Amino acid sequence: MKKIALLSLLFTAVSFAQIQKMEPPFWWSDMNLSNVQIMFYGKNIAQNEVTVSNGIVIKDIQKTENPNYVFVTIDTKNTPAQDFVFTFKNGKKLFTKKYSLKARRANSKFRKSYDSSDMIYLIMSDRFANGNPNNDSDASVTEKADRTNPNGRHGGDITGIINNLDYIQSLGATAVWPTPLCEDNDERGSYHTYGQSDVYKIDPRFGTNEEYLKLSAELHKRGMKNILDYVTNHWGWQHWMYKDLPTYDWVHQFPGYSQSNYRMTTQFDSNASAIDTKNCVDGWFVKSMPDLNQSNPLVLNYLTQNAIWWIEYADLDGFRVDTYSYNDKEGISKWTKAITDEYPNFNIVGEVWMHNQAQMAYWQKDSKVGAIESFNSHLPSVMDFTLYDALGSVFNEDKGEWDKGMIKIYDNFTNDFLYPNINNMLVFAENHDTNRFNQMYKNDFKKYQ
């Protein structure tokens, strides 16, 4: 009996040694996205033949130039919630890995999202409230807490947000948008977490995946909504996958470092040169943020499944998507459509930081401006940066001048006809990338009013 137990433990240890990552870690039955592409990562794992139990159908197996990856697509349509087993065999050697299809929450597909009736409270996650000082520095990540460093980690976390939800609600907020919470293992400046190193894992300095579930539950208990800040354009250079790329073109590569020219207008400018468009879309946002290649089907599928996984897992109510207009526009359109096909009422707002209404309208779903180039982003909402531009100066200007003062606000509204859905715009006076509104007006309370 002891010998059998020992062999069982040894077999399990071998299995874990062979598979270092399995993503998504589980899925759900009764999903619109029923052909699930599971990525297995481990030393020379592609040398194995892959089979699966329970009559589950393998639709496709993709191996890349990197033998440490294999992508296995299974058909889960009409498959009830259950556990099944993948078997990996190489000659006489074999090991197994359990996979789970879970039952969905009731009415998950038609979940209610945020809309123009909501007041959203934006939180810089590391800088809001420290609810658990014990997780300020974690052995698994490089940068430790240092409140003396303005660019360092200061200790804000998920527990701190939960502890202050009653306060946030008392301000009139009906939704919370924390800046990204997934792991960012950059050695410095990681507090913003826009350079993520593991997109299936909450940064341990913020808490755990389970604590993020609790945040959603506590928000919903109060009738409030949880908006996840998602990044499709780039990861951080410490992402575990960047250190061992599945394919050379998983990220955009250049002979040397090439930074984005930030000219988002090249995405639709009929006069733009091909090199300018390429530099905008394929160039890296900054040197520490490898630019993801959404025109690679494996990358696009990985990002799509990851986004849907977080919605279903954490019971989310919406997305804000960072640097939306820097992505490959056809790829990001497919990504957005896949999510809204899965969740028809799910709102997604894109950061389209442009200063012209026609250019911004191009990126909203069913835009007549986009239709000129036969493009539909499928993006329900965009952030109203032109209104933000006007709000930042109008109260400092002479109202008697023809094009100054409140006339700027009026002129902004006269262009509302360009948007296919003006009632689904995210209106704001400031955010984490801008000066505070009081800074713009030198703490003049009358102007603030």
Language-model segments: residues:
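Beta-strand/beta-sandwich contexts
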Residues: 18-46, 103
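Sec-dependent N-terminal signal peptides
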Residues: 4-13
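Aromatic- and acidic-residue-enriched segments that line the glycan-binding/catalytic groove
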Residues: 137-140, 186-202, 232-276, 358-374
